[in-house]
Design a protein with these regions (language model features):
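Residue patterns forming the tRNA-binding/recognition surfaces of aminoacyl-tRNA synthetases
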Residues: 2, 11, 15-19, 91-241, ...
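Helix-rich, typically C-terminal accessory recognition domains appended to large enzymatic cores
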Residues: 79, 144-156, 160, 408-437, ...
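N-terminal catalytic cores of NTP/NDP-binding nucleotidyl/phosphoryl-transfer enzymes
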Residues: 25-96, 100, 123-138, 245-246, ...
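Conserved oxyanion/phosphate-binding beta-strand-loop segments in alpha/beta enzyme cores
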Residues: 1-36, 66-75, 99-106, 282-323, ...
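Long, charged, mostly alpha-helical binding arms that flank functional sites
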Residues: 3, 224-229, 363-366, 370-398, ...
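Secondary-structure transition/capping motifs at alpha-helix termini
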Residues: 63-71, 91-97, 113-117, 144-150, ...
Length: 798
């Protein structure tokens, strides 16, 4: 059979769609399997090879599951709101709707051309009204239950994109979208109280099967810490400065306090501060810095000592000075810290620069740097002599609580989610601002709050949303009191639509609810979710938060959305570097399909290395996969033959290997095993037709077009994609014979082949006949024989 991919790949793709091979519906007589991949952001560049790898893993797994009799849901959609599309639309003077539709059409064509087995009847688009209606509905539920609030805050602002960014979207002081420097700006911000779910999000990680690194990243992102809150009285006024610390045991080593420059107590007691002009000047300097710049560990320490305000250490009773410094953030902890320079590197550097005392309270340091290890407590009154950190912390908390000056507590690194953007291409936030009633929710029966069509959607110079210019949208009536009111003009961030998309796939055409209870009960949770490591914090934590909230209010049936989460490694350029246009090392999957066919692309990407690790692209290996599929096709032209014990054993070993490797995402070794198998077939020069059919079913998840063609060429009228997955006979996977090492006095003299179940006498007879020990035993008497069944026969003689 000639491997002519151009002739049959599009044919089988059309047949699959015509006959709805991958379309599924609720069938309670079957076990369900919900496989999920991260739906793409449809960029103008189209799909890249990274998409093929990201989807290819679960593509193989879901095809196998379907053949194993599972009712498989494997959907796809498009996460199409967001800044990249809007920025491109502005640049090209094209409406975002047009850009989005064109890009989705391009992506759809490319995905179908690769032969992905998605259920195309369930496609969702986050920009469609029948989708974002329910995004708005969930937002209003969050608002209704007190998990949405508005506050004026210093926020991360991208001057290029002209919008507010969350901490997650501005890591490293750079905009996640355009990579411009982020600045700080005071704006009204909508927040989701994700911190209220911090403990539940941590606890939920114990009930799921995620890669260890994914669990670790989420735990670190949430950042739960155990410690204590303590109140330092201010000497000059009737006020207490509240701090949080994970090391209350070091409180006797506090020699100064540091407040964030924005701390409200500074303005409250401005008249008491003798150098307020210095404070104001320092604040102005801080306002020019991003949060990233302020919190860099290796930056030069700056600050101002407050003249006229002094703190009292609650345990020692000593007076300590108060500074303001930019490395303390108002949004972290309480906005103030106690400084223990002897045991904190940052505090040590600050103390050295400003000439503050350094008092060690843990034995072990040399005084030349901060000692951050464990040791015996010193200079700490009732804590002296304690060597166990946990005991010292507990003792300190106990005294603080007894004195009414503090209490044990927990803090989280994760902050509430900044949820609004001053841009056009996003879900309108369904809130009305009324002078009498405040912030009022748009009634549920008025959803969706539609995004108005705009020809000019460039953000305002001051960061004002383009929607603010649409009077017909802005001006409205308060749903509560009927007075004139104004609509919220900011839109939701791109993360909104992706925080629940896995639920809409279950019931994408339902106009009455986001998903029916029947569909939820049957399909949820997602059995296996695969995606990039770059999304295991932001997207996954956001979506877990939304899902857990919906569970708590009785709208979904499982506390966690994803039972299992895995991740693929990057595909690097041929030079071993990350692919980028600037490096000129980008590989276009369309060119590979044009030149070699979709099956070669699919097989190569699954074969190129450990699926979870990064692998460089290799054109020569692509050609090697083409030769492999040529040889597979060539087996159809081979003479037939009767099955033998050897051929059956080889096939059953292959079934076992491929089955296990797919389940464990060891796709490369599964393909390597198939390559080895056909080498044996070519060595034999013939293949049994029934055994060839079994091989074709094993190939089907990897190279489905060729598999379908061969299946029909072998006389079958059904789809191999729906053919039962082959089962192996364990007894036929065990070798009948084994090769064992023959040793004399512990030194290898050769090997012999013996029956796998051979006892010592049988093995010895074979060794004697082989002559492998004749020379070694000449003139000697055997003293002892040592036989390790199936491995070694050692002879001792003298």
């Amino acid at each position: 059979m000639k491997y002519d991919y151009k002739q049959y790949e599009s044919y089988w793709q059309n047949k699959w769609e015509e006959d709805k091979v991958f379309v599924c519906d609720i069938d309670k007589s079957k076990k369900k399997f919900y496989g999920l991949v991260e739906f793409p952001y449809p960029s103008g560049a189209g799909m890249h090879v990274g998409h093929i790898k990201a989807y290819g893993g679960l593509e193989v797994i879901t095809r196998k599951k379907r053949m194993e009799g599972y009712n498989v849901l494997f959907p796809i959609g498009f996460d199409a709101f967001g800044l990249p599309t809007e920025n491109y639309a502005i640049k090209t003077n094209t409406h975002p709707r047009t850009v989005t539709d064109n890009n989705i059409a391009k992506f759809t064509s490319q995905m179908k051309r690769v032969g992905f087995g998605f259920d195309w009847t369930r496609v969702i688009d986050t920009t469609e009204e029948d989708y974002y209606k329910w995004t708005q509905w969930i937002f209003l539920k969050l608002f209704e239950h007190g998990y949405v609030f508005r506050d004026k805050a210093s926020v991360n602002y991208c001057p290029s994109c002209r919008c507010v960014l969350s901490n997650e979207d501005s890591q490293g002081g750079k905009c996640d979208i355009c990579h411009s420097d982020v600045v700080q700006k005071s704006k009204d911000v909508w927040y989701l109280r994700i911190t209220k779910y911090a403990d539940k999000l941590l606890q939920g990680l114990k009930d799921v099967d995620y890669l260890p690194n994914i669990v670790l990243q989420q735990e670190n992102w949430i950042g739960k810490s155990e410690g204590a809150f303590a109140s330092f009285a201010l000497k000059e006024v009737d006020e207490k400065l509240r701090i949080y610390t994970t090391r209350p045991d070091t409180m006797f080593g506090v020699t100064f306090m540091v407040m964030a420059p924005e701390h409200p107590l500074i303005d409250k007691y401005a008249e008491k501060i003798g150098n307020m002009s210095d404070v104001i000047a320092y604040r102005e300097e801080c306002a020019k810095k991003t949060e990233f710049e302020r919190t860099q560990l290796n930056k030069d320490k700056t600050g101002v000592k407050l003249q006229g305000l002094t703190a009292i250490n609650p345990l020692s009773g000593k007076e300590v000075p108060i500074f303001i410094s930019d490395y303390v953030m108002m949004g972290y902890g309480t906005g103030a810290i106690m400084a223990v320079p002897a045991h904190d590197e940052r505090d040590f550097e600050f103390a050295k620069k400003f000439g503050v005392d350094i008092i060690p309270v843990i034995k072990g340091g040399d005084g030349e740097s901060a000692y951050t290890g464990d040791g015996e407590m010193i200079n700490s009154e009732f804590l002296n002599g304690i060597t166990n950190k946990k005991d010292a912390v507990s003792a300190a908390i106990k005294v603080l609580e007894e004195k009414g000056l503090g209490e044990g507590g927990t803090q989280f690194k994760m902050k509430d989610w900044a949820f609004n953007r001053q841009r056009y291409w996003g879900e309108p936030i369904p809130i009305v601002h009324c002078e009498h009633c405040g912030d009022v929710a748009v009634p549920y029966d008025e959803l969706p709050l539609r995004l108005p069509n705009m020809e000019q959607f460039v953000p305002g110079e001051g960061g004002e949303s383009p929607l603010a210019k649409v009077e017909s949208f802005v001006n409205c009536v308060c749903p509560k009191c009927g007075a004139p009111a104004k609509r919220e003009t900011d839109t939701m961030p791109q993360w909104a639509g992706s925080s629940w998309y896995f639920l809409r796939y279950l019931d994408p055409h339902n106009e009455k609810e986001f998903c029916s209870k029947e569909a939820l009960d049957y399909w949820m949770p997602v059995d296996w979710y695969n995606g990039g490591m770059e999304h295991v914090t932001r997207h996954m934590i956001y979506s877990r938060f939304w899902h857990r909230f919906l569970y708590d209010i009785g709208e979904v049936n499982t506390p966690e959305p994803y039972a299992k989460r895995t991740a693929q490694g990057l595909i690097l350029g041929p030079d071993g570097e990350k692919m980028s246009k600037s490096r000129g090392n980008v590989v276009d999957p369309n060119e590979i399909v044009d030149k070699y066919g979709a099956d070669v692309l699919r097989v190569y990407i699954m074969f190129m290395g450990d699926y979870e690790k990064a692998s460089p692209w290799s054109d020569s290996s692509v050609r090697g996969c083409k030769r492999f599929l040529d040889r597979v096709a060539g087996m159809a032209e081979m003479p037939g033959c009767a099955s033998s014990a050897e051929s059956e054993s080889a096939l059953h070993k292959l079934i076992k290997k491929v089955t296990s490797d797919i389940d464990n995402m060891k796709f490369n070794t599964a393909i390597a095993a198939m390559m080895s198998y056909i080498n044996g077939v070519y060595d034999a020069g013939a293949i049994n037709r029934d055994e060839l059919k079994v091989f074709v079913t094993l190939l089907a998840p990897f190279a489905p077009h060729l598999a379908e063609e061969m299946w029909h060429d072998l006389g079958e009228s059904t789809y191999v994609s729906l053919t039962p997955w082959p089962k192996y006979d364990e007894s036929k996977t065990v070798d009948n014979t084994v090769e064992i090492a023959v040793q004399f006095l512990g030194k290898l003299k050769g090997t012999v082949v013996v029956p796998a179940d051979a006892d010592e006498n049988t093995a010895w007879e074979i060794i004697e006949k082989s002559g492998v020990l004749d020379q070694a035993l000449e003139g000697k008497t055997i003293v002892k024989k040592i036989y390790v069944k199936g491995r070694i026969f050692n002879v001792v003689a003298k």
